[in-house]
Amino acid sequence: MAPTTATKDDSGYGDERRRELQAFDDTKLGVKGLVDSGVKSIPSIFHHPPEALSDIISPAPLPSSPPSGAAIPVVDLSVTRREDLVEQVRHAAGTVGFFWLVNHGVAEELMGGMLRGVRQFNEGPVEAKQALYSRDLARNLRFASNFDLFKAAAADWRDTLFCEVAPNPPPREELPEPLRNVMLEYGAAVTKLARFVFELLSESLGMPSDHLYEMECMQNLNVVCQYYPPCPEPHRTVGVKRHTDPGFFTILLQDGMGGLQVRLGNNGQSGGCWVDIAPRPGALMVNIGDLLQLVTNDRFRSVEHRVPANKSSDTARVSVASFFNTDVRRSERMYGPIPDPSKPPLYRSVRARDFIAKFNTIGLDGRALDHFRL
């Protein structure tokens, strides 16, 4: 699991650090604002402890005889035999927790438009970013740097544009101009894809194809656009610290720079090895989230992943993560392990809103799933 979150009393939080965090936040310019100001060394609020960085600078290479599951499977959705697709998804979700999708039906012009739009927004007029800057997690459209800025032991070197695409999307005219004609269309395309993936996952559990959909696992879609500016001291910080995703699953779109690292082997937890995942042009990546691990009683695996700080001297890295979950504001449904006569439940039932509230409280330094294990 990820390290336990430090509290304000024991993590070095003090008046001076709090002032530094607040001063950074008050600019409403994020990490890109620091880069634009010409910083040659990163502020101390971004310094991660040496033990957290010791294996991120040079992750372990894949061994010559990799552990079981030590590769990211590729699922080709043009395969006509549904049984083959179901078996591929079952294996990937139950071992690696990640898999590529190719021939997935999301148009390249939509994917390219999203990546360009995210880059143009972050590299465009600062007034557009400042107008959206907020730490109000209830807002369906907001820009910020580090959602857990005031909770984490150290900040990460990235900026984020958040958009709730379903069920409460913002009016199109409120979207940033570079994304106005692509965000909602991309959201619709990945939602259609997600419905099909949920069918395959349901069938791989031996359930009817609409089982997970009827459990309301995809009522909510949050599209989270990450921007990783070049870092003058990448050996002191990270782009995203190691974590697992809290929802049901994520569909990830990346640019060609790479940077994603996944913990493979030993079910993606402590003891596995960190592996660089090279980009795959035209492909989308799916990773299982914590709530799906919970409802499948560990049959599917939510695996740790991270992003090192951007070592490029002049080019930012961009990615777009589509997080699928239930409607946490309205749903009263209790989520617990699907009954299995061969295995006792490993988790207690929980409302999704309470699960996400725990995630938001502890931030990326901890893992919400562990708090619900029996």
UniProtKB/Swiss-Prot annotation:
The Gene Ontology terms for molecular function here are: 2-oxoglutarate-dependent dioxygenase activity; DIBOA-glucoside oxygenase activity; metal ion binding
Q: What does this protein need as cofactor?
A: L-ascorbate; Fe(2+)
This protein's GO cellular component annotations are:
cytoplasm
Residues that bind 2-oxoglutarate: Y228, R317, S319
What positions does the entry give for Fe cation binding? H243, D245, H305
**Do the record's keywords include Cell membrane?**
no
Q: Briefly explain the null phenotype.
A: Loss of DIMBOA biosynthesis.
The reaction(s) annotated as catalysed by this protein in its Swiss-Prot or TrEMBL entry are: DIBOA beta-D-glucoside + 2-oxoglutarate + O2 = TRIBOA beta-D-glucoside + succinate + CO2
Compartments in which it is found: Cytoplasm
List the expressing tissues: Expressed in seedlings and newly formed crown roots. Highest expression in the scutellar node. Low to non detectable levels in cob, tassel and mature organs like husk or leaves.
CC cofactor note: Binds 1 Fe(2+) ion per subunit.
A Pfam family of the record is 2OG-FeII_Oxy
Q: Which PANTHER family match?
A: DIBOA-GLUCOSIDE DIOXYGENASE BX6, OXIDOREDUCTASE, 2OG-FE II OXYGENASE FAMILY PROTEIN
Q: What is this protein called?
A: DIBOA-glucoside dioxygenase BX6
User: Species name for this entry?
Assistant: Zea mays (Maize)
